Amino acid sequence: MNNNILNKLGITLNAMQEATADAVLHTGKDVVVMSPTGSGKTYAYLLPLIQRLDASSDALQAVVLVPGRELALQSANVLKDMGSGLRSMPLYGGRPKMEEHRVLRDVKPQIVFATPGRLNDHLDKANINAETIKWLVIDEFDKCLEFGFQDEMMSILCKLPNIERRILLSATESETIPNFVSMGRTVHLDYRTEDENIPDRIRLYTVTSPEKDKLEVLKKLLLSLGDKSSIVFLNYRDSVERTALFLKENGFTVSWFHGSLEQREREAALYRFSNGSAPILVSTDLASRGLDIPDVDNIIHYHFPETEDSYVHRVGRTARWDKEGRTFFILGPEEHLPEYVTNEHEEYKIPETLLKPAQPRMATIYIGKGKKDKISKIDIVGFLCKKGGLKSSEIGKIDVKDRFTYVAVSRTKIKEIISLTKGEKIKGIRTVVEEVR
């Protein structure tokens, strides 16, 4: 394993990751990995895969199929953070295929992270050379089947004639692996146990609401949790927006996330939550899978998960790797914990005296230039320090996208930054600077 990459990432491999790397690097067989949500499966396949791909070649060598655009984007970012020298690109619906095709020609990625439908489109139009692809990874294989991508995946496999190795990853066990995947000799790695479904390091609480409408109890619960990061799960998009609006009106700094939002809105919501400028994320189950946000302290079930699998994946957003976390069920009148919740739990008593909502230290700004304008993180820091009057210590996480950039900055400096940078140029290009709310 590349120790330089591990040191850069600041991680130590767990048993599942070590076993996966060993199977990929040393057995020559296809690999199936079953491991709980939050155990680090993205690193498990990427760390060995990057050692088998040729960074000096312009050929596309590996395809990673994922069930949704968020996982495609996050997986590409994980690879970027590893600093392997490999070029990658996420491919997903909701944006023009022609634009993706142009970027494919320019970037010449060695690996793509793609949703099945969009990859099929590019293969059908010969935008991708299928002959050079030797590696196939299907991440969240169980979810791909659950979402009904079986026909799309079958079509993809028929168009990839030279696949030599396959890696399938899942948090749950599928009844069978469909024949179209064409698994050869296979190493099966199962790191699931009954005890690991909900790790012991997650503490389970119930909170009683005397009213069917639980918003007041949710407000008090969040007040009692202070500045800790929390995801509030609901089952309906309208409920997400209603709840988020209620919390905003009561002084909380909130992001919300569901499938009807535009892609940029979804990216902004996740970015504000992950960089700490919005410590509360209100979401449907869309946020329960595929999102790699490492430091979520609390999971709150405003609406109960509809299935045990949904419960496991919601709770898997906290206590990732070896960290601790808490999960809360808000119980309305006549509501009881679902039968599948078998862990020990205790009643959470909300203190009578509560402080005002905690205000995060950071806020997020949008800068209207990105990679396509030859803008780097160093350029962003220089611009904000020179033109925006910031110290480097007042700048947090920076995410440079193709056409724009998100930056976490000190909340107390927001108005000053926007005033000072109005009409200013970055690398000779005039740009827009706005707060992301």
Predicted regions, residues:
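A short beta-strand element within the Helicase C-terminal
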Residues: 289-304, 326-330
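Non-catalytic terminal extensions of ATP-dependent helicases
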Residues: 350-437
